[in-house]
Design a protein with these regions (language model features):
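Hydrophobic/aromatic-rich structural module bridging two neighboring secondary-structure elements via a short loop
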Residues: 82-83
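N-terminal intrinsically disordered, cationic/polar leader segments
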Residues: 2-66, 76-77, 87-127
C-alpha cells in the first residue's frame, strides 16, 4: 500500500511500501500515520484558502480519501492491536471524514475547516 502526495518534492516523505509497514514497530507506525495526517491537514488548509473548485481542493480530497481508506482498512483487521471500541470509534470518524470529503468533491459542501479540526484532533491523539 502506498500513501503519497501528488507533489513530487514531498512524495518520498509520505510514500510507504508494504514491506516497510510490516517491518516497523507500533511507535514507528503511529509516527508514519501522524506524518500522513499532517500532510492531509496541510493540503486541506491550502484547499480552504484556494476554494472548493480549485486544484488544491481536488488534491486534498483525493489524498484524504485515500489515506482514510487505508486507515479504515487497517483498523478493521482483527490483528490490529488497538482496543475494539477505539477501533470502532476511529472507523466511524474516518467514514465521516470520507463522507465530508466526498461532499466537497460533489461541490455540496466546503467544510474544510471541519475536516481540519477533526484531523488535527486525531493527529494529536497519536502516540
Amino acid at each position: 500500500m502506498t500513501v503519497a502526495t501528488t507533489d513530487p518534492g514531498k512524495k518520498a516523505m509520505y510514500q510507504f511500501s508494504y514491506a516497510e509497514v510490516l517491518d516497523e514497530t507500533p511507535k514507528g507506525a503511529r509516527e508514519r500515520e501522524r506524518q500522513a495526517i499532517d500532510r492531509s491537514i496541510e493540503l486541506l488548509q491550502q484547499a480552504d484558502k484556494a476554494g472548493a473548485r480549485s486544484r488544491e481542493a481536488i488534491e486534498a480530497v483525493l489524498f484524504v480519501r485515500r489515506l482514510w481508506g487505508y486507515l479504515i482498512e487497517d483498523l478493521a483487521k482483527p490483528e490490529n492491536d488497538l482496543p475494539q471500541s477505539l477501533r470502532a470509534e476511529l472507523i466511524s470518524i474516518g467514514l465521516w471524514i470520507m463522507r465530508e470529503a466526498e461532499q466537497i468533491r460533489l461541490e455540496t459542501s466546503t467544510n474544510f475547516k471541519g475536516l481540519i479540526e477533526v484531523s488535527t484532533a486525531i493527529r494529536d491523539g497519536l502516540q
